[in-house]
UniProtKB/Swiss-Prot annotation:
It comes from Nanoarchaeum equitans (strain Kin4-M). Residues 329-337 are annotated as: Interaction with PCNA. Binds 2 magnesium ions per subunit. They probably participate in the reaction catalyzed by the enzyme. May bind an additional third magnesium ion after substrate binding. Mg(2+) 1 binds at residues 29, 81, 153, 155. SMART domains: HhH2, XPGI, XPGN. This is Flap endonuclease 1. Its cofactor is Mg(2+).
Length: 339
């Protein structure tokens, strides 16, 4: 679901061109990207399927979009979620009680063409199956694209890699990685570069958006710890929002209290201190990415033989993939030798 910090980050977000990300390493929240691919392939929001009725949208999106990123000179690392913290499971269980209501909202969002809303409800309903995740990992391996299995939250791991300088940005549509301390987040890199306006036959250009944590904190004159408390008042993946509090009110409350722990205590947020501490110190691991050579036969087996993808189209895409990866690996080699 992600935390809704849109109003808080909007004053400082910057629209950029894809070419400005040339040579940059981006740690992409894999689950977030797979949800995007799952629902953004077709305009009706319904997933693509093979001849056996199995969903293939996640593979199509992952394959072609990753190649597009590589052609822009972007070096992606996909970060997969591990074991969720126990308070996230509790939050999921509570939300499942409203499953019928969520299912209705999900279908309504699809009908209206509001894919972002549909994705939000799909996440709560658990529309991403484990076999899709495993297929995605196999495809990335075949493509020569690095991925890391996070011990817990993918966005926490992506934030850690960005803080360490392994990656230049976290790539996600959500804002959670800011709470985990990522210095920079880039949005709109795993979605189509043209988006249909809900209910209209009009397409608008979608550009990457960069949000810097320091800019957010400086604009509102708050600390990262206070930003976490604000997010908790607004509702996160781990706790329900406090009724009647919007973004501006949340900022005022946290500034008035000063100490974020006092805010959590005053509003009696369930597991509040534990959640707060988790945002500050989540489980993470070290990772050194390597971009390899594509295994053409294996890609063909996964996409064409197993899932009925068009062989000519896949063949052409593999050529693009090989060319883009060669270029990236050559540049990495040159920079290693200081050329």
């Amino acid at each position: 679901m992600g935390v809704n910090l849109k109003e808080i980050v909007d004053p400082v977000k910057k629209e950029i061109e894809f070419k400005q990300l040339f040579g940059k390493v981006i740690a992409i929240d894999a689950f977030n990207a797979l949800y995007q691919f799952l629902f953004s392939i077709r305009q009706d929001g319904e997933p693509l399927r093979d001849s056996k009725g199995r969903i293939t949208s996640h593979l199509s999106g992952l394959f072609y979009r990753t190649i597009n990123l590589l052609e822009y000179g972007i070096k992606p690392i996909y970060v997969f979620d591990g074991t969720p913290p126990k308070f996230k499971i509790v939050a999921w269980e509570k939300r499942k009680k409203h499953k019928e209501q969520l299912e209705s909202k999900y279908k309504e969002a699809l009908k209206k063409g509001n894919i972002q809303e549909a994705i939000k409800y799909a996440k709560s309903l658990g529309k991403l199956d484990s076999y899709m995740v495993e297929e995605a990992k196999k495809l990335l391996e075949a493509m020569g694209i690095p991925y890391v299995q996070a011990p817990s939250e993918g966005e926490a791991e992506a934030a850690y890699l960005t803080k360490k300088g392994v990656s230049d940005y976290c790539g996600s549509q959500d804002y959670d990685s800011l709470l985990f301390g990522s210095p920079r987040v880039v949005r709109n890199i795993t979605i189509s570069e043209k988006r249909k306006l809900p209910g209209k036959n009009i397409y608008v250009e979608v550009k990457p958006e960069v949000i810097e944590l320091e800019a957010v904190l400086n604009y509102w004159k708050i600390t990262r710890e206070q930003l976490i408390a604000i997010a908790m008042l607004l509702g996160t993946d781990y706790n329900e929002k406090v009724p009647g509090i919007g973004p501006k009110t949340a900022i005022e409350i946290v500034k008035r209290f000063g100490d974020p722990i006092k805010v959590i205590e005053y509003y009696k947020i369930p597991n509040g201190k534990e959640i707060f501490e988790f945002f500050l110190n989540p489980p993470v691991i070290d990772f050194e990415p390597k971009w390899g050579k594509p295994n053409k036969e294996l890609i063909f087996k996964i996409l064409v033989e197993e899932h009925d993808f068009n062989p000519e189209r896949v063949e052409r895409a593999i050529e693009r993939l090989e060319k883009a990866l060669n270029k990236i690996n050559q540049k990495t080699l040159f920079s290693f030798f200081g050329s």
